[in-house]
Amino acid sequence: RASGQRILVTGSGRLDLYRFGGDSLQGRYHLLRLHPLSVAELGLTTANDLRDLLALGGFPEPYFAGNDAFARRWSREYGSRLVREEVASLERIVDLGTLELLIGRLPALVGSPLSINALREDLQLAHRTVASWLSALERLYAIFRLAPFGAPRIRAVRKEQKHYHFNGAVVPDGSARFENLV
């Protein structure tokens, strides 16, 4: 590092959005996407190691703490900060409580096709609102969506995407949590 060089490390997805904003940060920052720790990065070799990763999640703080209670508390705080600070600063959302309900509903749906229409009906919101909130969660690296692999057999039938969480510890079902990890 050069003398006098200053580095800012942030855990926010907001820096990624500066590319689309009015202020130019050209040459003043480098965007690095840090994903949760993987099996290979941790050098896991036993089934117990894998169980710990599945139970605690791949984020460094809860994983290295090695404590289920700490991991649950960290996960709750992460979700709350995501809604109250990150999403609220990027989107004009009037009803943060309903957004929290959406975020609370999503982990149970990992591994199955994500129907925006079903979520819309559950939350009594407009389709556009739910789609916008899901996009905001993607931009902030809370979730990511994968489209089905392969060409559609019938053009009129469009398959829904599946979604997964960067914080896999929030997924309640063991098999879905394993799918989320992979």
Q: Where do the PLM segments sit?
A:
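Accessory nucleic acid-recognition modules appended to NTPase machines
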Residues: 68-182
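A generic local structural motif
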Residues: 2, 18-20, 130, 150-151
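Interdomain motor-coupling "hinge/lid" segment immediately C-terminal to the ATP-binding subdomain
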Residues: 3, 12-115
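Conserved beta-strand termini and adjacent loop/short-helix elements that scaffold enzyme active sites
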Residues: 10, 34, 146-148
